[in-house]
């Protein structure tokens, strides 16, 4: 163990048996079990709020989370003399959800539904006071930390309008590029088709009930994980009955939690999986059913999911990344992402037709 690591861990009331490095953190074998020491990057203001969320989830019976341990002084983070800030989290013996295994993806979908069932403010509406230091998740007063208004869900209408403007700006720039490379030619060839999808998403949004769904979600105090993907879903190892409980799951890394329409998490998770599986209708339908079996999906939520899937998100992200990068050298990864987005358009079209009865 390095001297600095030892100095950080000495701030906690634990006995350390051994440590080993892992991706961006340090795994610690202790008398309390497996823990993860991680440096806080960026603002630390949300850490006490995050601690409150973890406490709330556990009181609701959702216990398999990477809750934050407090220091000997009762702080949520350990602050070092050199300015470094660290959190010590509960961790689990296990591995990330395997995106190649449908059974694990279905279990992860059901796990998300269980999380959403409990991930609401206990006193009804989500108010800023719940995050800025007056009333906490557990009803206690004045926990530190603040969530700005900009952290609340931005309206999809303004988001899509902005994204479409950005796509037009990228096209204008690409047309002016000389000489053009593989990325530029591919982008221009597919632009009209992809932009049509963006316009269709905006039009579908305008006639949907998504606005009411957002208001109702805020009224009920609905929260989202914010980054529910297979990296943050751990399949736990251990002694238990595999026939009765095939997979035991821990959900980790809630740092991006916020008030939002809860199926935004489902959209994000399902989109990531579908992009890796070529938008296979059967798998997507099974994942939706696995979620809905625990937390039924309303008509408005299905509309919301449809609108989100219509928008060419991967195409926009790739174009945005290109525009913000060094355009003199386009990475092969960006070219590959663009080609994938183009190639999967027909597959996604069939997915939307069969799952949501949407026809462009």
What residue ranges belong to the model's regions?
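ATP-binding glycine-rich phosphate-binding loop
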Residues: 6-29
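A glycine-centered beta->alpha junction motif in the catalytic cores
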Residues: 86-99, 169-177, 269, 311-329
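ATP/Mg2+ or Mg2+-diphosphate-binding catalytic cores
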Residues: 316-360
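Active-site activation/catalytic loop segments of kinase-like enzymes and analogous catalytic loops
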Residues: 263-296, 309-328
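ATP-binding pocket architecture of kinase catalytic cores
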Residues: 33-129, 136-148
């Amino acid at each position: 163990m390095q001297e600095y690591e030892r100095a950080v861990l000495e701030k906690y009331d634990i006995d350390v048996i051994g440590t080993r490095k892992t991706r961006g953190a340090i795994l610690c074998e202790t008398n309390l079990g497996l823990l993860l020491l991680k440096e806080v990057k960026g603002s630390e203001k949300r850490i006490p709020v995050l601690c409150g969320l973890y406490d709330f989830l556990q009181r609701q019976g959702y216990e398999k989370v990477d809750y934050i341990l407090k220091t000997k002084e009762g702080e949520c983070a350990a602050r070092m003399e050199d300015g470094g800030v660290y959190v010590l989290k509960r961790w689990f013996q296990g591995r990330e959800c395997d995106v190649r295994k449908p059974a694990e993806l279905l279990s992860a979908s059901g796990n998300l539904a269980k999380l959403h069932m409990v991930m609401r403010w206990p006193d009804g509406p989500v108010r800023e006071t719940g995050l800025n230091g007056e009333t906490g998740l557990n009803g206690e007063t004045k926990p530190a930390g603040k969530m700005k208004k900009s952290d609340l869900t931005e309206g999809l209408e303004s988001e899509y309008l902005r994204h479409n403007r950005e796509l037009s700006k990228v096209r204008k720039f690409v047309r002016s590029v000389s000489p053009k490379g593989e990325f530029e030619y591919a982008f221009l060839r597919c632009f009209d088709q992809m932009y049509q999808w963006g316009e269709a998403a905006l039009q579908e949004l305008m006639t949907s009930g998504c606005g009411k769904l957002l208001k109702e979600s805020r009224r009920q105090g609905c929260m989202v994980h914010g980054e529910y993907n297979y990296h943050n879903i751990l399949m736990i190892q251990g002694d238990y009955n595999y026939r009765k409980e095939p997979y035991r799951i821990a959900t980790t890394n809630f740092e991006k939690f916020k008030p939002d329409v809860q199926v935004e998490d489902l959209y994000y998770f399902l989109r990531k999986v579908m992009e890796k599986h070529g938008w296979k209708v059967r798998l997507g339908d099974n994942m939706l059913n696995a979620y809905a079996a625990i937390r039924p999906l309303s008509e408005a939520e299905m509309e919301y999911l449809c609108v989100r899937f219509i928008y060419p998100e991967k195409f926009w992200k790739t174009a945005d990344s290109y525009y913000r990068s060094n355009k003199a050298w386009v990475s092969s990864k960006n070219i590959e992402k663009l080609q994938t987005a183009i190639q999967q358009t027909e597959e996604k079209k069939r997915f939307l037709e069969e799952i949501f009865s949407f026809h462009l």
